[in-house]
Amino acid sequence: MINKYTKIMSIILATLLLSGCTSSIGNDNDLEKDNGKIKIVASFYTMYDIANKIGGDKVSIKTMVPSGTEPHDWEPSSKDIKDLQKADLFLYNGAGMEPWAEKILSSIDNKKLVIVEASSGINLIENQAKDENLKNDPHVWLNPLLFEKQMEVVKDALVNIDPSNKEYYEKNFRENSAKVHKLDKEYKDSVSKFNKKDIVVSHAAFGYLCNAYGLNQIAIEGINADSEPSPGRMAEITKFVKDNNIKYIFFEELISPKVANTIAKETGAKTEVLNPIEGLKEEDVKNGKEYFTVMRDNLEVLKKALQD
């Protein structure tokens, strides 16, 4: 009896361990095994999060860009293209965020595939750095109200694909829309209390966030995450930090903090993470991190930086 019990417990534990090894943001999902669910391929984490929030248990999501990877310069593999051949919906941000998307979509032979560009219909911020190949800033989701618009685009697509579950998708959208407006109010109430409005960031990813709440981003590097600041730009930022009593230099987890650390060392400022939510680490997702929690983390570090 004891041996039988031990064997049963061993099987249960093994099952739990195996399930714990499965990617929680869909990098390892096998779309062929998800019978009855809408099969979604999401380009990177933020698109996964939107699809998950609206689709819930009615969808199976495969995320293309691996966990913790910077999506700007990632390139798809032949396996990713095969996944698109099996998918019902391909969700990508657009606006230049995934420069590889148009190239691979032209090679896909999947007549049922619905292609959804989440930034479609949104007024984009023009990229002021003329030496970069990006026409616009693609980081629209950092304005919560634009994130809501992206969720609505996905909701409408899922309703069209799967009208029998219309009420389910609309309910999920309403619930997350309420969370968006609560978050938006928290940002407005908090930021309005500070006279200081300038933030120094390593990467010009926060234009939509700043426009939404009256902030001004001073970017060391351009919208392209792999751009390099010139010595002149470094000197200009260093002077600005000193002249304006900037206490924090923001950097991103997926990009080297070397430049931010250099300026912080020269000016006496501190460094802190401001997350553009392009690609969360697997560990963070397993610990409950998602769009709303990370945006609140961002608000807390912004409040520290804006104090006089």
Model-derived regions, located:
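N-terminal secretory signal peptides that target proteins for export/translocation
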Residues: 1-3
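Extracytoplasmic metal-acquisition and chelation regions
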Residues: 5, 10, 20-308
